[in-house]
């Protein structure tokens, strides 16, 4: 007797025909002439490569030939032999971190504090500039590290290729809606600013006073 293995997966209280739950399966088409048009292939299993810190894993980023991992209250580097190296301590909370890089500097925004690891000099440091207001998320665009200030509408940029230096006037406000910013990303050369009720899209205008500017009409209500 043939049992159809393709189609919808469901679980019901009362089932007349079948009751199935498909886990870790994906469809694969059978070449023309096969007995069935397709079948469900099992997904490859996972293999433990290494253990990084004590957890939880709060962020991962690949830079060059290394994997940089924030686990618990520390930053680690993992090489291609899965050897784990401790690089420095960050604030020990469980919230996810935001990570960005410019090829040589890895920047980690840790729900307020921000840290920088220089891959060329192997120096790890916290941003202590007196004008630094704290950072929720961080991204990289055209030489600037772009970050949003906690509990505010403000988006900031660091000095050019220097995430340890912050000018007190290098910020602007996402004011199309009076909501605070909660996240941000850089995608296709644009800065997406996510508020609790709205999304704004900015770009690098090259202006001397502040490089970022909102794209006209690029505003969405959530």
Give names to the regions the model predicted.
Residues 32-34, 53, 89-92, 120-122:
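Intrinsically disordered, low-complexity coil segments
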Residues 98-130, 138, 146-147:
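Hydrophobic or amphipathic alpha-helical targeting/insertion segments
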Residues 126-127, 202-221:
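Blade-edge beta-strand/turn elements of extracellular beta-propeller
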Residues 1-84, 135-196, 200-202, 206-207:
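N-terminal beta-propeller domains
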């Amino acid at each position: 007797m043939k049992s159809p293995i393709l189609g919808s997966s469901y679980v019901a209280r009362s089932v007349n025909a079948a009751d199935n739950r498909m886990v870790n399966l994906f469809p694969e088409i059978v070449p023309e002439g096969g007995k069935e048009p397709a079948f469900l292939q099992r997904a490859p299993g996972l293999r433990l490569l290494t253990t990084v810190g004590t957890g939880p894993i709060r962020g991962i980023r690949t830079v060059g030939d290394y994997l940089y991992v924030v686990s618990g209250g520390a930053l680690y580097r993992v090489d291609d032999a899965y050897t784990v190296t401790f690089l420095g301590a960050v604030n020990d909370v469980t919230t996810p971190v935001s990570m960005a890089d410019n090829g040589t500097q890895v920047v980690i925004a840790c729900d307020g504090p921000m840290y920088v690891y220089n891959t060329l000099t192997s120096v790890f440091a916290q941003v202590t500039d007196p004008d630094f207001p704290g950072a929720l998320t961080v991204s990289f665009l055209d030489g600037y590290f772009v970050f949003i200030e906690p509990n505010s509408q403000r988006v900031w940029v660091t000095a050019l290729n220097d995430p340890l230096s912050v000018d007190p006037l290098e910020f602007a406000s996402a004011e199309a809606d009076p909501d605070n910013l909660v996240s941000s990303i850089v995608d296709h050369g644009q800065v997406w600013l996510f508020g609790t009720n709205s999304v704004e899209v900015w770009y690098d205008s090259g202006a001397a006073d502040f490089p970022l500017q909102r794209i006209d009409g690029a505003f969405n209500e959530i």
